[in-house]
C-alpha cells in the first residue's frame, strides 16, 4: 500500500513522528505493526495510532547507531513524499479488552505499541486498572510524558510510571531508576498486585522481554498471560 507522508515532526531530540495518509480505510488491531517497504529491505515499526484512526497511521521513528536499516529509513524520511507499507502484522495485539487488570511494559520506542493499546482502551471505556511502565535511558527520552500524564490525571484507572536506566540521571529526575521490568515487578509486589490476574504486554528487545518473562513467572504470573512479538519473531530455544 502506498501512503502519502502527511507530516513529519520531532517528538524530542531524535525521535520523529511520521503521519501517513492511507489511500483507503485500513483495519488492524491495537498493538500490531507494519513494515515500511524499501527497495532492498522491509523495516518493521509498531503502529502508534488506534484502529479508530482508520485513514491516518502514526509511527515513531528513532535512528539506531550503526544500523544500515535505520540509515535507509532516515534517508527516505529526509527526501520522500510517500512510503510503501505492508500491514497489519504481528501476533501481539488487543483483539478484545482483557477481563481484568492490564500491565504494559515498554522499552524505548516500544512505547508506540502501548500508546495504541492505551488509547484504544480509553475509547472503549475500559474499567480495569492499566499499569504502564516505560523504560528509557535518559529523562529526555520520555517524549510522551505529557500525553500519559494527562491520561493519568483524567482517568481513575491509569497509572504511568516512567523508568530511567541511566545510573545517575541528575537532580531533575525524581522518578524510578533501573531496568523497567525489574522496577515494574518490584512496585507491583510492593502494592500487593496479584500477578496471576494480570494480562501483560511487553515491547522491547529479546533480552529485555525474556528477562521480564522469567522474573514474572518466578513470582507467579502464568506464562500464557504475557504477550510479546518477540515470542514469535525471536523464539527462545
For the regions a language model picked out, list residue spans one by one:
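Reductase modules of NAD(P)H-dependent flavoproteins
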Residues: 137-237
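A structural signal for isolated positions on well-ordered beta-strands in alpha/beta enzyme cores
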Residues: 58, 84, 103, 129-133, ...
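Small/polar loops that bind or transfer phosphate-bearing groups
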Residues: 61, 105-106, 136, 203-204
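A short, basic/flexible loop-to-alpha-helix module at the beginning of a structural domain
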Residues: 87-99
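Ferredoxin-reductase
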Residues: 1-81, 137-138, 164-166
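Short, glycine-rich nucleotide/cofactor-binding loops
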Residues: 102-111
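Histidine-anchored nucleotide/phosphate-binding helix
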Residues: 111-123
Amino acid at each position: 500500500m502506498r501512503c502519502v507522508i502527511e507530516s513529519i515532526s520531532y517528538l524530542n531530540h531524535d525521535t520523529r513522528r511520521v503521519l501517513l495518509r492511507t489511500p483507503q480505510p485500513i483495519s488492524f488491531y491495537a498493538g500490531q505493526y507494519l513494515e515500511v517497504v524499501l527497495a532492498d529491505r522491509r523495516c518493521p515499526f509498531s503502529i502508534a495510532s488506534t484502529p479508530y484512526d482508520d485513514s491516518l497511521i502514526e509511527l515513531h521513528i528513532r535512528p539506531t547507531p550503526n544500523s544500515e536499516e535505520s540509515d535507509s529509513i532516515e534517508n527516505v524520511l529526509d527526501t520522500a513524499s510517500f512510503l510503501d507499507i505492508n500491514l497489519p502484522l504481528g501476533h501481539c495485539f488487543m483483539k478484545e479488552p482483557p477481563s481484568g487488570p492490564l500491565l504494559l511494559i515498554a522499552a524505548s520506542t516500544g512505547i508506540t505499541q502501548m500508546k495504541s493499546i492505551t488509547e484504544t482502551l480509553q475509547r472503549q471505556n475500559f474499567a480495569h486498572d492499566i499499569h504502564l511502565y516505560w523504560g528509557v535511558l535518559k529523562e529526555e527520552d520520555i517524549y510522551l510524558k505529557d500525553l500519559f500524564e494527562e491520561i493519568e490525571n483524567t482517568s481513575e484507572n491509569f497509572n504511568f510510571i516512567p523508568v530511567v536506566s541511566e545510573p545517575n540521571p541528575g537532580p531533575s529526575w525524581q522518578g524510578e531508576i533501573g531496568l523497567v521490568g525489574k522496577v515494574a515487578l518490584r512496585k507491583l509486589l510492593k502494592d500487593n498486585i496479584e500477578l496471576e490476574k494480570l494480562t501483560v504486554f511487553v515491547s522491547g528487545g529479546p533480552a529485555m522481554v525474556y528477562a521480564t518473562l522469567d522474573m514474572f513467572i518466578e513470582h507467579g504470573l502464568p506464562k500464557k498471560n504475557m504477550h510479546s512479538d518477540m515470542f514469535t519473531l525471536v523464539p527462545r530455544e
